[in-house]
C-alpha cells in the first residue's frame, strides 16, 4: 500500500500520500463489478479465514486440547467471558455471544490486514464497511429493546429516570440526538477514523523515508534513519490499536445490548 504513494515528482518536491490512496480502483477487468475493489476482496477473504480457523479448531475436540483447539477455545472464551458475560451478564448473555464473537474477529482480521506486508490495507480504512457494521449493531440494539420492553422502549431510551420534570424539555432532545442519531455515527467513525489515521501516518512515514534516502544531502539521508525508527514504532503501535479497536467496537455493542435489556432500571 505504501508503494502506491510516490513521494517525489520530477520537481524533487515531497508529495505525501492522501486519503484518496485508500480509494482503490476495481480489481476486475469488466465494468459490471466496478465496486469490487481490494477492500471487498479482503473482506470476503477474512470470512474464509475466520471460518476455516474455527472449523479446524473444533473439528476434533479432545479432553486435552491440542494447540489449535486450545487457541480456538481461548479466543471464544475471551469474547464469551470478558465481553458478553462481564457486560451483559445474567442468563441472557449467551444469546448474544455469536453476534459479539463474529463482530470481534471480523473486525480484528480486517484491521490486522494493515500490518501484513504486501497487503497493508485495513479494510475499515474505508468508511463504508464501518457504516454497515454500525447499522447492524444499531438495528439489533433497537430490536432487542423493543422485544424486551415493547414500544415503550423508546420512552425508556429518551426519558431518564429520576430527572426533575422541569428539566425534561432540555434532556429529552439531548437523549434523542445522542441515542438515535449520534450513537451509530460515532460507533462507525471511531473505527474508521482510527484505522484511516494510523495507516495514513505509516504511509507518510514510508514515503518520507524513500524521499530522504533519494536526496543528495548527507544530513537528509541520515535523517531517514530517525524517520525509519519512528515508522517502526508507529507500525507496532498501529498493530496494537488494530486489536484494541476490535475490542472497543465489540465492547460498546455489548454495552448497548445490556442497556436495551435493562432499560427500565437505568
Swiss-Prot record:
Q: What is its main location?
A: membrane
Q: Where in the cell is it found?
A: Cell membrane
CDD domains associated with the record: ATP-synt_Fo_a_6
Q: Could you cite one Gene Ontology molecular function of this protein? A: proton-transporting ATP synthase activity, rotational mechanism
Keyword list (alphabetical) reads:
ATP synthesis, Cell membrane, CF(0), Hydrogen ion transport, Ion transport, Membrane, Transmembrane, Transmembrane helix, Transport
Q: What exactly does this protein do?
A: Key component of the proton channel; it plays a direct role in the translocation of protons across the membrane.
According to its UniProt record, which protein family does this protein belong to?
Answer: Belongs to the ATPase A chain family.
The name this protein goes by in its record = ATP synthase subunit a
Source organism per UniProt: Arthrobacter sp. (strain FB24)
Amino acid at each position: 500500500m505504501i508503494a502506491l504513494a510516490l513521494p517525489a515528482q520530477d520537481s524533487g518536491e515531497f508529495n505525501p500520500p492522501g486519503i484518496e490512496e485508500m480509494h482503490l480502483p476495481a480489481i476486475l477487468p469488466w465494468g459490471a463489478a466496478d465496486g469490487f475493489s481490494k477492500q471487498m476482496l479482503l473482506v470476503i477473504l477474512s470470512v474464509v479465514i475466520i471460518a476455516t480457523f474455527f472449523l479446524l479448531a473444533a473439528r476434533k475436540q479432545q479432553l486435552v486440547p491440542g494447540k489449535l483447539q486450545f487457541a480456538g477455545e481461548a479466543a471464544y472464551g475471551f469474547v464469551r467471558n470478558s465481553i458478553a458475560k462481564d457486560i451483559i451478564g445474567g442468563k441472557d448473555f449467551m444469546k448474544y455471544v455469536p453476534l459479539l464473537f463474529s463482530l470481534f474477529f471480523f473486525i480484528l482480521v480486517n484491521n490486522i490486514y494493515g500490518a501484513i506486508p504486501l497487503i497493508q490495507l485495513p479494510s475499515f480504512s474505508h468508511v463504508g464497511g464501518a457504516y454497515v457494521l454500525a447499522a447492524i449493531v444499531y438495528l439489533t440494539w433497537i430490536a432487542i429493546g423493543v422485544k424486551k420492553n415493547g414500544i415503550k422502549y423508546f420512552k425508556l431510551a429518551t426519558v431518564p429516570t429520576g430527572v426533575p420534570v422541569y428539566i425534561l424539555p432540555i434532556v429529552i432532545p439531548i437523549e434523542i440526538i445522542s441515542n438515535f442519531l449520534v450513537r451509530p455515527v460515532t460507533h462507525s467513525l471511531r473505527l474508521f477514523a482510527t484505522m484511516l489515521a494510523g495507516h495514513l501516518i505509516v504511509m507518510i512515514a514510508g514515503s518520507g523515508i524513500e524521499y530522504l534516502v533519494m536526496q543528495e544531502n548527507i544530513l537528509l539521508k541520515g535523517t531517514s534513519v530517525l524517520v525509519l525508527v519512528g515508522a517502526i514504532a508507529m507500525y507496532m503501535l498501529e498493530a496494537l490499536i488494530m486489536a484494541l479497536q476490535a475490542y472497543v467496537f465489540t465492547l460498546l455493542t455489548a454495552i448497548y445490548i445490556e442497556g436495551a435489556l435493562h432499560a427500565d432500571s437505568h
